[in-house]
Amino acid sequence: AFRGNQFAKGAAIGILLLTVFAGFRIYHLLPASLAFAFMIALVIGICLLAVLQDALALAVLGILAGFAAPILISTGSGNHVALFSYYALLNIAIFAISWWRSWRVLNLLGFLFTFAIGTTWGVLSYKPQLFDSTEPFLILYFGIYLLIPILYAIRRGSDRPGAIDGTLVFANPLIAFSLQAWLLARAAFVASQPE
């Protein structure tokens, strides 16, 4: 009955998320800012519910909805600072959830979505003039995903001594430093061009 209860809650929140999306995108009843605020409120609610009820499935639904929200509610403005600020808050929320629950899958989902969306934005929209507003987010994301495996090891240490999240321990520096090199190479190329 407990798992069925979680399924019902997850389905209800999923329906609410789809309702907000339809109200914005299909029926044009909600402005983007209000639809986004509703989605954020739903994501916060589902993540709190997941932690309080120790429900990993609800947490996964919340994080997936959280990463999808700016894509679903996008107006095409291209404001990368707002997008990366929102993802920074979402990643800090994942870190906070990691403080109470050692849910590895949540850490991996956050890492994958953050760097996949960031890399996609970089390939499609990055210009060297945006370096100063992009670099701090890369450093912040690297720092968050540097701390999460440490916290995971501490939390899991009593259950499984020596447990580490090797995926994040090795993938985080590999991807972050690759992106850093790419950002600097693009900036150096522009700086070397005659004016």
Question: Can you describe what each PLM-predicted range is?
Answer:
Residues 1-195:
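Alpha-helical multi-pass membrane segments and their bilayer interfacial helix-loop junctions
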